[in-house]
């Protein structure tokens, strides 16, 4: 895993989002419209986070998933920044800010799923081979 100084120098946008809890512009991230099968990993530490099997089109402007690949891969934190009350999602392994989770995902088996709204820059897709 790269140090914060290395991260800041090599990828300032990733540093801003992952370490300063920033948000990338909507509809600009490289994975918003991605359809490839694979596993999305943390761009900071390479931990497995989200499977493409749970990715869906939310029209929010960010990649959205119904569940992490493993609930133990992420941690959830109260976020009241910007005058809003939200639930922040972080990588459990390195603490990188990934995005937020909302309770307005698609319906499955008569229940509304969560919508993990994740910044593309915080992810690295490793396609299935």
Q: For each predicted feature, which ranges?
A:
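A short Gly-Trp-Pro
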Residues: 1-129
